[in-house]
Amino acid sequence: MTPKEEFISIFKENITRPGGDKLLHWLEGSDFFIAPASTRFHGNHEGGLVEHSLQVYKCLLGELDTVDLKTRYTNETVAIVGLLHDICKTNFYVKGFRNVKENGVWVQKEVYEIKDNFPIGHAEKSVIMLQNFMKLDADEIYAIRAHMGAFDCAFKGGDQFLNNIFNQCPLALLLHLSDMKATYIYE
């Protein structure tokens, strides 16, 4: 099964709320399944975004088991936050070129560049994009909003929202840990 097929299977099996079908149709018409997860770091290759999304989802399932919280959240909620936390990266990257030196010779190398047509912020954009298709509950919003943890620009600027969210919503902390585990251990 390809990553795209696996993603669609998990999505259809778990995400059944109104608007989910329209969201999946939109994803299939977008670059979600071929987009990279980043320009230079984890998953910076074609299909990296869907691979990362699947890995975060799988890590989240494991984290929920580890702390015995699996029954606190529905399969749908876990699938939404795990698979779709980075939906903001859809239609976000374009291919470009950069000059790099290889063996003492300058060569032109194809790279991914950012083209942000909706510069509202990473996690905020994911929440907004998802809510254009379906209603999210508070825990889903908290988890997606806080999934960047201390890498979030608002936190770096001194905002204390993370402490409040992590204290109120264990799912948010577990999604953040799953994102970090996927990024730094598995990818």
Enumerate the language-model features and the residues they cover.
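Generic signature of intrinsically disordered, low-complexity segments enriched in small/polar residues
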Residues: 10, 14, 35-36, 60, ...
